[in-house]
Regions:
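N-terminal membrane insertion elements
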Residues: 2-147
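PAS/LOV and related PAS-like sensory modules
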Residues: 2-7, 24-27, 140-179
């Protein structure tokens, strides 16, 4: 259902206060074939960017000055009304992993990170995210079909009701032979 071209065309936001990390992740993802990359070193900009672009994946550093990744995740939860916030956290703090997952992150990568592991986790998360989006779309189509069928059924019931009301006005006569 999801092919590699869909995954490579997914939108990704990279958020890290270290320019070297942003450049490394951008280069790695571009070399892997990803085409829709955005990055910011300003954690305050993340919510507005996501509100405008609805990224398929956000790579989020947890330790940033001014606003940490946990505060960013709380802001993103307010935007994503369906409860699914597509965040892969990047952290050097071992104690932050479980806290990040509990706060809504879907996965994490420990710094310093292994590029093969990061690419694999990104690919897997995007595959799940795109499948989730396909499922949402399919559910909407099913709901539309149910609404259409319900309307057709109501219309059919109304026609039947009108016919039975007319039939009660009719009367039948038979002769002695039953004709």
């Amino acid at each position: 259902m999801i092919d590699n071209a869909d995954i490579l065309n997914a939108s990704i936001l990279i958020v890290d206060d270290q320019k070297a990390n942003v450049q490394l992740l951008e280069q790695m993802l571009r070399e892997a074939g990803y085409r829709r990359l955005t990055s910011t070193m300003d954690p305050h900009a993340v919510c507005a960017l996501h509100r405008d672009n609805h990224y398929d994946l956000i790579l989020l550093d947890l330790k940033m000055p001014g606003m940490d990744g946990f505060q960013v995740m709380n802001g993103l939860k307010e935007i994503e009304t369906n409860g699914y916030v597509p965040i892969l956290v990047i952290t050097a703090e071992p104690g932050h992993k479980l806290r990040a997952l509990a706060a809504g992150a879907r996965d994490f990568v420990a710094k310093p990170f292994d590029l093969v592991e990061v690419k694999t986790r990104i690919h897997n998360m995007l595959e799940v995210r795109l499948l989730y989006k396909h499922l949402e779309q399919y559910n909407q189509e099913l709901e539309q079909t149910v609404q259409e069928r319900t309307a057709e059924l109501r219309e059919s019931e109304a026609r039947f009701r009108r016919l039975t009301e007319l039939a009660s006005d009719w009367y039948w006569e038979q002769d002695e032979n039953g004709h």
